[in-house]
Amino acid sequence: MNTWFSKSEKMTTKPFLETTKYIQEVHLDVSKYHDLNKQLQLLKLTKQDLAILKQLQPYTKDLIPTMVEQFYASISLSPDLMHIIEKTSRIEKLKITLNKHLSDIFNSRIDSAYIEERKVIARVHVRIGLRSKWYLASFQSLMSSFIDFIQTIEMPPREMAQAVNAFSKVINFEQQLVIEAYEHEEERIREEAENVK
């Protein structure tokens, strides 16, 4: 487990989260996507959750690089995944992309641009042959890194749980976007192959 703060700065009962202070800085608008509105309702992903992540944004200067390193360390355990990556890109370039991707999460602006960017990433992964199960499994590394990180911040256990829940909801939402984009792209590729026959 990484330690971003000293032991004296750890868990307390003093409130830490101030979502009302950050709620005006977040943006949640998926009105162009009827199904996504339903998905957000099922997840109970709200502006309140985004405000929690926004408040944590200043702390992510050290967190995000750690998440990126741990993410690629877990991927490197699979020779097949490394072969796909090395065949199509460079790890350093992908690390920069993931760094931006994670920064966007803590920027707490979920809108059309955010959604379309995630869909593009998923389509690229389909085209390079990265199967959805590997992409989805890699999200666990991000979740584990976040949980380790949140335990280093001085806040009541209840608020830690709220922060983990907020991050988990966004990650789950992203996984749903990825699965849907994978399905659409795989269907498009199948249709193209059938048209060639």
List the predicted regions and their residue ranges:
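Short, charged/polar micro-motifs that form catalytic or ligand-binding hotspots
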Residues: 54-61, 84, 88, 92, ...
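N-terminal "first-domain core" detector
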Residues: 51-84
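Short hydrophobic/aromatic-rich motifs at helix boundaries and adjacent loops
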Residues: 42-45, 53-54, 70-75, 93, ...
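Residue-level detector of well-ordered alpha-helical segments, enriched
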Residues: 59, 63-67, 71, 94-98, ...
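Structured interaction and signal-relay segments at domain junctions
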Residues: 71-72, 76-106
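Long, amphipathic alpha-helical coupling/dimerization segments that relay conformational signals between
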Residues: 2-31, 42, 47-48, 100-196
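SIR2/sirtuin-family catalytic core signature
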Residues: 37-40
